[in-house]
Amino acid sequence: MNDINPTPVDTPDDPRLEDYRDLTDIPGRRKLEGDEFFICEGPVAIERLFASGHHIRSALVLEEKAPRLQQLFAEYGTSAPLYTCDRNVMLAVTGFDLHRGVIAAADRKPIPKGTARHNVLAGLDKITVLEGLNDPENLGAIARSAHALGIQALVLDERCIDPYTRRSVRVSMGEVLHLPTMRFDSPDDLRNLLRDWTVWALTPHPLADNIWTLDVPKRLALMLGEEGPGLHEATMAVANQRVRIPLNDNVDSLNVGNAAAAAFAIVSRPSTS
């Protein structure tokens, strides 16, 4: 393992820190990052970033945080720049108090499109389909639960937020970086993509089947819709079955992140047969 020597930066207008500029400017960040790179923050998420195989562009850390990042750079053979600065410089660059003082930029992996999506899904047996999720924290929470509970890929419609937004990556604790992600553009496209899958649509409707009572199929795609409206009827029609999580009286529904975690745990439980 090679020793990595940090590069001190003492001014916020240093052009080498451009990837980290104004992180709270959402439109500006979309324009800057595009489909090229993303930001990961926090020690745990960054450890998961290194383990994910994404190419690291650079890291920016408070001076006292450098030793752990040096270990990660050496462990994974990373040759990207490791910049250090004080808290005032980091605040001026990023636009907010990054209290954990650890942030990195990494290149995105290409998103599979068209028939390439079938190749990605070929060896999998449990995936989730998300429609209309526009809250990065919900998506991040779902990705974290998915990877923890045996869900192997995310299939998103075009209205879902970018799963690589900084807040999604942070809330997922970096787990979203370990899940293949792809898009579908219409119910017909989704139906074609999932032609070899059993598809369940999760809904709070009382006439839907109790998910606890069902045998989990060999290949299952579990669909969830956005907070409030849920799945569109045309998307729901792709499903072979509509399922619900039974709730106590007077509770009509769960937050989509909580519902996803519960459903993932149910469908991934060991068989008792």
Which sequence ranges carry the predicted segments?
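Short acidic-hydrophobic, aromatic-tinged amphipathic segments that line or gate anion-handling sites
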Residues: 6-13, 81-86, 179-189
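Boundary-proximal intrinsically disordered activation/regulatory segments immediately upstream
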Residues: 1-70, 160-162
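Short, aromatic/basic amphipathic alpha-helical patches
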Residues: 67-79, 234-235
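RNA substrate-binding interface of SAM-dependent RNA methyltransferases
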Residues: 4, 110-207
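Glycine/small-residue-rich loop that forms an oxyanion/phosphate-binding "nest" at active or ligand-binding sites
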Residues: 74-103
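Structured adenosyl-cofactor binding patch, chiefly the S-adenosyl-L-methionine
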Residues: 104, 145-149, 163-176, 233-273
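Active-site/ligand-binding-proximal alpha/beta "capping" segment
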Residues: 200-251, 255
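Amphipathic alpha-helical repeat scaffolds
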Residues: 42, 134-142, 254-258
